[in-house]
Curated annotation (Swiss-Prot):
UniProt catalytic activity: 2-[(3S)-amino-3-carboxypropyl]-L-histidyl-[translation elongation factor 2] + 4 S-adenosyl-L-methionine = diphthine methyl ester-[translation elongation factor 2] + 4 S-adenosyl-L-homocysteine + 3 H(+)
Organism: Schizosaccharomyces pombe (strain 972 / ATCC 24843) (Fission yeast)
Coiled-coil region(s): none
Classification via NCBIfam families: dph5
Superkingdom to which the source organism belongs: Eukaryota
Designated name of the protein: Diphthine methyl ester synthase
Compartments in which it is found: Cytoplasm
Amino acid sequence: MFYLIGLGLFDEKDITLRGLETVKKCQRIYLEAYTSILLVQKEKLEELYGKEVILADREMVESSSDEILKDADNCDVAMLVVGDPMGATTHADLVIRARELKIPVRMIHNASIMNAIGACGLQLYKFGQTVSLVFFENNYRPQSFYDHIKENVSLGLHTLVLLDIKVKEQSWENLARGRKVYEPPRYMSASLAAQQMLEVEEDRQENICTPDSLCVAVGRMGSDDQVIFAGTLQELAEHDIGPPLHSVVLVGRDVHDLELEFLRAYAVNLENFDRVAKTYLEK
């Protein structure tokens, strides 16, 4: 059997009881280590499980799926995933490949940012499509995220923005020269995300990601020191919410007054928050 097991949001203790029982019976255990990160070292997992955990980077997951699935028709193999197992298309690819090899698959779910974001007080059923925001480079500044946010804005819906993670990435030069030299890990901050959104707004001028757009930023969700920030996009661009991981929400115009009341507790500037929130309620 091939198992995809969600680890939850923070540390080794967030795995479900069912997930832990399953891991302990597996002969081989991989930790998917590039679509998200756990906020503890893998040694903590190994200590809890009493088993070796193999780090599976992008290259292994995308290019060596048959190696991961090897013998899973005769023994139990697990892929551990931060958050929920189906939070990335890569994991769907693994399931499809396992099916092609006639290997049975089972998923064990867990909390992810997709549902934990409700901790900020915004109602989950009022969210539109989730978007991803990548690091802007000199010659690479994609704006497709802006168009997706625009669609959500037109419907009055909130937008969850997932921020870029660079783990075991190569520079363009090293990639072109075929050198397996990797850059240090980078995790996009909420403030940088806000800055990039404002840059695109300045270019597009469509009033989608304006300095006065209400937003929420969350950091280290599920941890003991998680932080929730509420304010304008301009305020977020100037505010540091600490170590990773971060996510951002742009508040939709169809926001309910109870949602705004909940958010007030996290406002970085209450007077300014109330001023901007009033314009949302006057829609």
